[in-house]
From Swiss-Prot:
Name of the protein: NADP-specific glutamate dehydrogenase 1
Gene: GDH1
Family: Belongs to the Glu/Leu/Phe/Val dehydrogenases family.
Active-site annotation: K110
Source organism per UniProt: Saccharomyces uvarum (strain ATCC 76518 / CBS 7001 / CLIB 283 / NBRC 10550 / MCYC 623 / NCYC 2669 / NRRL Y-11845) (Yeast)
Database matches in PANTHER family: NADP-SPECIFIC GLUTAMATE DEHYDROGENASE 1-RELATED
SUPFAM superfamilies: Aminoacid dehydrogenase-like, N-terminal domain, NAD(P)-binding Rossmann-fold domains
UniProt keyword Oxidoreductase, yes or no: yes
Length: 454
């Protein structure tokens, strides 16, 4: 069976490991690869509901419970017409390693439903969520498998799914994360991936410049305009950077003087009503006061002028090899991914070559991979699980502080593994290899200790 997305994720991990001295120094780890690449369990189920016309509809539901050596399965639910087993296996496989880098007790999994929610009423979406959870509730629990949201599953859907679980199981427990604040959710959860991405990038800047530089005065190109992009943009602006772009599936906006926090707030409120950036730019007064250029059908990478930092926050394979070359030509020094697998293998090769072949640190381009750079969301999901188990709610300051600590610790682990197991000479260590090696060792050690590999 052809599984291109999963194969791409698997090949990326394997190439990092093969290209390091890990197997040479510790041959036993090679035995883990064929075991960890096979999910512990794949659940496929039929989901049927009545639509608003009174007709019955059916869709395929999935939960891939990939690996529980480090803790309960943890990973999002995606409701989207593109959902298939290859995509969920790719996301679940990545999730195992990403979750291990948080330092929290979480395994990896992913699930979803092959359905398009666009144009459906609130009532129908509630019926879909209840129908989906009717089957999924047999397979999850706070110590077994704790799903979260993903594409197509936001706060509203999590609410319906949680209500359905409570109804079917007669149990109020922290079985989902991303919950509402007044019924078990965590502060900073919506902001977590975007904030965490910026904290990770800040750690990259600190290391590369010996603490001499920060986001202050940096020009930052961001793609996407959803949660991750919005909160990354707001944090960059707060830290003194200039955000020169945002995008959606129909086009991008470019502002050489900088997109403002007021404009980001307008995008946030308009996106709830599924408005496109083109509509938002035409309708909101903040965009007349501070003009932006809207480019239809384009991604921002080749349209921005000089940039220091690129943060892809939209979707998979959104930066091509040619676009990566354009970013390098425009002076980009740091690239960190807010989206999963945002850069194609060709783009990653461009960034990694620019890093490895730079004659000085000033000429180098440093790439932060998604399994490390965007783990802020799942980190705060883990903190939500911790709060639920104690039936308490932490302050936003405490959650933000814990998030920052997790992102910096993750960066340091990536650096340490890259230095120990790769031969980079004077170049900046490869964070791609560092993240893959550090996370692989953590998961492998747990599997050896528990007899999953022997």
């Amino acid at each position: 069976m052809s599984e291109p997305e999963f194969q791409q994720a698997y090949d990326e991990v394997v190439s990092s490991l093969e290209d390091s001295t890990l197997f040479e120094q510790h041959p036993k780890y090679r035995k883990v690869l064929p075991i960890v690449s096979v999910p512990e369990r794949i659940i496929q189920f039929r989901v049927t509901w009545e639509n608003d016309k009174g007709e019955q509809e059916v869709a395929q539901g999935y939960r891939v419970q990939y690996n529980s050596a480090k803790g309960p399965y943890k990973g999002g639910l995606r409701f989207h017409p593109s959902v298939n087993l290859s995509i969920l296996k790719f996301l679940g496989f990545e999730q195992i390693f990403k979750n291990s880098l948080t330092g929290l007790d979480m395994g990896g999994g992913k699930g979803g439903l092959c359905v398009d929610l666009k144009g459906r009423s609130n009532n129908e979406i509630r019926r879909i969520c209840y129908a989906f959870m009717r089957e999924l509730s047999r397979h999850i629990g706070q110590d077994t498998d704790v799903p979260a949201g993903d594409i197509g599953v936001g706060g509203r859907e999590i609410g319906y799914l949680f209500g359905a679980y409570r109804t079917y199981k007669n149990s109020w427990e922290g079985v989902l994360t991303g919950k509402g604040l007044n019924w078990g959710g965590s502060l900073i959860r919506p902001e977590a991936t975007g904030y965490g991405l910026v904290y990770y990038t800040q750690a990259m800047i600190d290391y590369a410049t010996n603490g001499k530089e920060s986001f202050e005065g940096k020009r930052v190109t961001i793609s996407g305009s959803g949660n991750v992009a919005q909160f990354a943009a707001l944090k960059v602006i707060e830290l003194g950077g200039t955000v020169v772009s945002l995008s959606d599936s129909k086009g991008c906006i470019i502002s050489e003087t900088g997109i403002t926090s007021e404009q980001v707030a307008d995008i946030s409120s308009a996106k709830v009503n599924f408005k496109s950036l083109e509509q938002i730019v035409g309708e909101y007064s903040t965009f007349t006061e501070n003009k932006v250029q809207y480019i239809s059908g384009a991604r921002p990478w080749t349209h921005v002028q000089k940039v220091d930092i690129a943060l892809p926050c939209a979707t998979q394979n959104e930066v091509s090899g040619d676009e990566a070359k354009a970013l390098v030509a425009q002076g980009v020094k740091f690239v960190a991914e807010g989206s999963n697998m945002g850069s194609t293998p060709e783009a990653i090769a461009v960034f990694e070559t620019a890093r490895a072949t730079a004659s000085t640190l000033k000429e180098s381009v440093w790439y932060g991979p998604p399994k490390a750079a965007n783990l802020g969301g799942v980190a705060v999901s883990g903190l939500e699980m911790a709060q639920n188990s104690q039936r308490i709610t932490w302050s936003s300051e405490r959650v933000d502080q814990e998030l920052k600590k997790i992102m910096v610790n993750c960066f340091n682990e990536c650096i340490d593994s890259a230095k120990k197991y790769t031969k980079e000479g004077n170049a900046l260590p490869s964070l791609v290899k560092g993240a893959n090696i550090a996370s692989f060792i953590k998961v492998s050690d747990a599997m050896f200790d528990q007899g999953d590999v022997f």
